Design a protein with these regions (language model features):
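N-terminal Rossmann-like NAD(P)+-binding domain of SDR-like oxidoreductases, especially those catalyzing
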Residues: 1-175
Length: 175
């Protein structure tokens, strides 16, 4: 699980550890770099290690192909699933530093895909993303305003969630 100390990644670690799986987590606490000490995921990492005996953490940047390859070589065919949650998390930072943003989000992902193909091609690769990829298109859905929340009508094809068929074309993004 990449981004294993982030919001979604840490939940995946807890879920699969509690199901009895051995979980390898990769996270380099990039949030601290972007957001300072208040963005650090060190406490989350320490809690994951303390509470999940089947969890092994590696402090690796997904842009570092050689470091990632060491992990893939170590676990090889024991890798039964890859959940990719790692990303450059700051949209404002991405606007100001687009090359770094691209290197983490695109090149890092490509590293993982290539290594998965080489060492465990039969294993599913789940790529997590952000709602930001949809830009303003979700705002065009026909919502119902309730007392405490907005909902989509039950007969809407996206009632149970938005999947990969939802268009990201011709929409505004973070900048």
């Amino acid at each position: 699980i990449t981004g294993s100390c982030g919001l979604v990644g840490s939940e995946a670690v807890n879920f699969f550890s509690k199901k009895g799986f051995d979980v390898v987590g990769i996270d380099n606490n990039l949030r601290k770099f972007f957001f300072g000490n208040e963005g650090s995921t060190t406490k989350i990492k320490n809690n994951l290690i303390k509470n999940n005996k089947r969890f092994k953490h590696y402090d690796i940047d997904i842009r570092n192909f050689n470091s990632l390859e060491k992990i893939y070589k170590k676990y090889k065919k024991n890798i039964s699933l890859i959940i990719h949650c790692a990303a450059q998390p700051s949209h404002d930072y991405g606007k100001n530093f687009p090359i770094l943003d691209f290197n983490v989000n695109a090149s890092g992902t490509l590293n993982l895909l290539e290594l998965t193909k080489k060492y465990c091609a039969e294993s599913p690769f789940i790529f997590m993303s952000t709602n930001k990829v949809y830009g303003d298109n979700p705002n065009k859905l026909n919502f119902i305003e309730n007392k405490t929340r907005w909902e989509i009508k039950k007969n809407n094809k996206y009632y149970n969630g938005i999947d990969e068929r939802f268009s990201i074309d011709n929409c505004t993004h973070s900048f």
